[in-house]
Amino acid sequence: EGTVTEITATGIGAHASTPDVGNNALTGLLVFLGKLDFASCPQVDMVRKTASLFPHGDVNGKTLGVAMEDELSGNLTLSFNMLTVDAASMDGEFDGRIPVCGNDENVLEVVRARMAEQGLTLLNKALIPPHHVSADSYFLFSDRYEETIKTLYVDNNT
């Protein structure tokens, strides 16, 4: 009693478009915390429920029921990135790359329903609509990208 234990979880960072090449420290930490014999309390219960929705290694939303892909943009990717828990609340953030076939109905509302089943509330009102940029787009060539960024952010702000 009165002892404080500090736990540091270290992962391998990865872009949200390729979370499979990383090792998510947060979801790994949730696995570890879920195995500890904590007394039941709302915070511990919510952390365990969150861990059940975002299991370590599930980078495509399978557990949430939103795994999908299309030929143009590939697989949906999902990364659980932030979690803050205090005596009164819990707040988490996840990032995803949604294929162009994804929308509010087949992604956002499915996630909202799965979270509600666990007593969690998704606050997002709408998805940022998926988009695709062709690989041969003028914008993607590095010299053109740099030229465009310079025009947008330097030339227009001087």
Walk through the language-model features, giving the residues of each.
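A generic structural signal for well-ordered alpha-helical segments
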Residues: 2, 115, 145-147
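N-terminal entry module detector
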Residues: 1, 108-111
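Transmembrane helical segments that form the transport core of multi-pass membrane transport proteins
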Residues: 111-122
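Internal metal/ion-chelating core segments
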Residues: 1, 5-11
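An extended, acidic, His-containing surface patch that forms the Zn2+-binding/catalytic region
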Residues: 13, 17-89, 97-106, 121-158
